[in-house]
């Protein structure tokens, strides 16, 4: 993962996630030993509950879910030590309980394009709560004429580097049994880390404009945006 980020000039993400060069090897080998960036794939319910309890104590976590909600990445961590946890519907017993837990009001979340996420959660009968910041909306408020606020564009706009393409983890078979998980995992984790990095960058700029946060400002732009939050 370090070599992939280095190749893409992810200097800020390398620092953010606490990556190091580690032993030589391909992306696949480094992702199998994800410890360099303290990331993990959660397959045990006890570990799931432990992480949910931890996140309830934090002021926020960054969350990115695939459109089907079958895969979720959560990023958090202290100074210079990013951490990531990956959850997959076909690998975690009680996955729906995880979704209810992570999208509960007790866990404060930073997300990208909260409105679309809320629609998907509501369609699955889940109550989307606890969103405290939307990086897509924040980017719109700061540059309303840009036209596109996709993560791939924002990484170039604000940090002058390119992240892996979202299609790497959005493909229907990206995490299938016959797929090589290295590339989609790297893309999903880097996009989630980028959400956190954007939050750290955009929130102070919104404060300078006198806005308390992207979520609060949403009500003035779209009355339906914050419904059920």
Regions found by a protein language model. Name each.
Residues 212-214:
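Extended, non-catalytic structural segments that build the interaction scaffolds
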């Amino acid at each position: 993962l370090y070599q992939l980020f280095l190749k893409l000039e992810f200097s800020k993400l390398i620092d953010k996630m606490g990556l190091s060069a580690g032993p030589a090897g391909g992306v696949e080998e480094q992702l199998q030993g994800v410890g360099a960036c303290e990331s993990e794939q959660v397959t045990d319910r006890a570990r799931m509950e432990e992480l949910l309890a931890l996140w309830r104590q934090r002021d926020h976590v960054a969350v990115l879910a695939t459109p089907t909600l079958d895969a979720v990445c959560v990023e958090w961590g202290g100074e210079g030590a990013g951490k990531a946890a990956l959850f997959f519907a076909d690998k975690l017993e009680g996955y729906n309980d995880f979704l209810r837990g992570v999208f509960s009001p007790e866990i404060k979340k930073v997300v990208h394009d909260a409105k679309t996420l809320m629609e998907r959660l509501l369609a699955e009968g889940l109550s989307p709560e606890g969103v405290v910041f939307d990086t897509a909306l924040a980017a719109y408020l700061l540059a309303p004429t840009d036209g596109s606020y996709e993560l791939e564009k924002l990484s170039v706009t604000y940090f002058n580097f390119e992240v892996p393409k979202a299609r790497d983890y959005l493909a229907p078979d990206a995490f299938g049994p016959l797929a090589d998980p290295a590339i989609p995992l790297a893309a999903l984790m880097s996009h989630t880390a980028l959400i956190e990095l954007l939050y750290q960058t955009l929130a102070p700029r919104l404060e300078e404009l006198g806005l308390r946060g992207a979520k609060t400002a949403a009500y003035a732009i779209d009355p339906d945006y914050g419904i059920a939050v």
